[in-house]
Regions:
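Short C-terminal tail/terminal secondary-structure segment
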Residues: 1, 6-10, 112, 161, ...
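The beta1-alpha1 cofactor-binding region of Rossmann-like NAD(H)/NADP(H)-dependent oxidoreductases
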Residues: 55, 75-89, 120, 232-233
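Substrate-binding pocket helix/loop in short-chain dehydrogenase/reductase
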Residues: 113-115, 119-127, 219
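Active-site loop-to-helix junction immediately N-terminal to the catalytic Tyr of the SDR YXXXK motif
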Residues: 118, 162-170, 182
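Active-site helix of classical SDR
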Residues: 138, 172, 180
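Residue(s) in the substrate-gating loop at a strand-loop-helix junction
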Residues: 156
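Short, small/polar-rich loop/turn modules that mediate ligand/substrate recognition or access, typified
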Residues: 188, 193, 249-251
Length: 263
């Protein structure tokens, strides 16, 4: 992938903000997930990296986590299957003993010019991976999360400003924003926080893999900053939301959009 995304490999500096915490990150093999895994490890967290089947990419992320002196656990599997979601959490509990941070970040998208072009199977898969997996992961993790734990959903600017050619994807990202808002209210009495992050155009492998070439070439130019963001520019937000510094932040959605407002 050219240019190579910046995941903070050479730039992110930790300060112990997540020392001793145990994190689960889905879609952690590349893109935003890799950047978050690197940042979490450099802040002192052990990380379970859930991914589909990109073993080489996942091993590269694990190498960065271990280089930071933290434990990396790799778990391949298709999150469209609820049983896989439960197995991810089971593995985290087996190795770590608990879950302090859950980042539901894995996503699937395809572009289509008309509604009729969208295969039923693709609609179902998009909802299963992007939205239903978030539910199944959270439900499985909650018995192993204590006060001070944090749940973070990767939403999108498309939740408020949907791109019509990304209809299924946009619908799921709006769902994630609403799910975290509801979770924040349901889980407050347990001391568990839930928030979402709404990225704008971020340069990840998902972009050239799912978009027409002409859209890839102009990707990010539509926002006020006139460029795509890098995964490394998102990671500090995920660190904040996972840390005790955000102890009164729950039910929020933080936009990282290059100047495109979400109101």
């Amino acid at each position: 992938m050219e240019p190579t995304p910046d995941h903070g490999e050479q730039s992110y500096r930790g300060s112990g903000r997540l020392s001793g915490k145990k994190a689960v990150i889905t879609g952690g093999d590349s893109g935003i997930g890799r950047a978050v895994a690197i940042a979490y490890a450099r802040e002192g967290a052990d990380v379970l990296i859930s991914y589909l089947n990109e073993d080489e990419d996942a091993q590269e992320t694990a190498r960065w986590v271990e280089e930071a002196g933290q434990q990396a656990v790799l778990f391949p599997g298709d999150l469209a299957d609820a049983a896989t979601c439960r197995a991810v959490i089971d593995k985290a509990v087996e190795v770590f003993g608990r879950v302090d941070i859950l980042v539901s970040n894995a996503a699937f998208q395809m572009t289509h010019e008309t509604i009729e072009e969208i295969p039923d199977e693709e609609w179902d898969r998009t909802l299963a991976i992007n939205l239903s997996a978030f539910f199944h992961l959270t439900k499985a993790a909650l018995p192993h999360m204590g006060p001070g734990s944090s749940i973070i959903g990767s939403s999108s600017v498309n939740s408020d400003n949907p791109v019509p050619t990304l209809l299924p994807y946009s619908a799921t990202k709006a769902g994630i924003a609403n799910m975290t808002a509801s979770m924040a209210q349901l889980l407050a009495e347990r001391g568990i926080r839930a928030n979402s992050v709404a990225p704008g155009p971020i340069w990840t492998p998902l972009i050239p893999a799912t978009m027409p070439e002409e859209q890839v070439e102009s990707f990010g130019q539509q926002v006020p900053m006139q460029r795509a963001g890098q995964p490394a520019e998102l990671a500090p937000v995920y660190v904040l939301l996972a840390s005790d510094e955000a102890s009164y932040v729950s039910g929020a959605r933080i936009a990282v959009t290059g100047g495109q407002p979400i109101l």
